[in-house]
């Protein structure tokens, strides 16, 4: 079995320090947030899409350590019934484009949830109402 780690847990570390930390734990693969609502601390999607040299440098740091990207993460809700959903769709597209340029074969994503009716402005996600996300409690009460 091969293990990977989602690098968001090392958001306080620089990209190279994070890679060194992960390698010191005996892990050779990383999942990096490249879109959605994640911090994207270690994977600047816009920069990497725009600059082939940056992509080579980015991948070179992994290769120096004998590491690889197991997946790019773009968890979000592209079906969100507002401008937010459009932004998430773009984010997912950019993540998929970057994955192709980097040779990454897996993307972690969420399908998302649509509105509950034609005039909804929040996703219809009332199965999680206690603590997260905080905007769902009013929908549940409604």
Model-derived regions, located:
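Residues that form or flank phosphate/diphosphate-binding pockets in enzymes
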Residues: 13
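Active-site beta-loop-alpha junctions enriched in small/polar residues
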Residues: 6-10, 33-37, 74-77, 112-114
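Glycine-enriched alpha-helix->loop->beta-strand junction motifs that scaffold or abut catalytic
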Residues: 25-29, 103
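Extreme N-terminal starter segment of soluble prokaryotic enzymes
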Residues: 1-4
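Conserved beta-strand positions in the central sheet of alpha/beta enzyme cores
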Residues: 31, 71-73, 108
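Active-site acidic/histidine proton-transfer and metal-coordination neighborhood
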Residues: 16-17, 21, 55-68, 78-142
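Conserved N-terminal beta1-alpha1 strand-loop-helix module at the mouth
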Residues: 17, 21-25, 34-47
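Glycine-rich, positively charged N-terminal anion/phosphate-binding segment
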Residues: 33, 41-63
């Amino acid at each position: 079995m091969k293990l990977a780690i989602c690098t968001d847990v090392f958001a306080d570390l620089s990209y190279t320090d994070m890679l060194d930390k992960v390698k010191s734990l005996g892990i050779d693969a990383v999942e990096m947030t490249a879109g959605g609502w994640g911090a994207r601390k270690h994977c600047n999607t816009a920069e990497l899409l725009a600059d082939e040299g940056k992509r080579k440098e980015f991948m070179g740091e992994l290769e120096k350590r004998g590491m690889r990207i197991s997946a790019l993460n773009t968890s979000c809700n592209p079906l969100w019934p507002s401008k937010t959903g459009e932004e998430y769709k773009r984010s997912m597209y950019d993540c998929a484009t970057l994955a192709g340029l980097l040779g990454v074969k897996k993307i972690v994503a969420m399908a998302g949830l649509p509105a509950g009716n034609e005039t909804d402005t929040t996703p219809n996600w009332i199965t999680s109402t206690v603590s997260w996300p905080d905007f769902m409690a009013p929908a549940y009460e409604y």
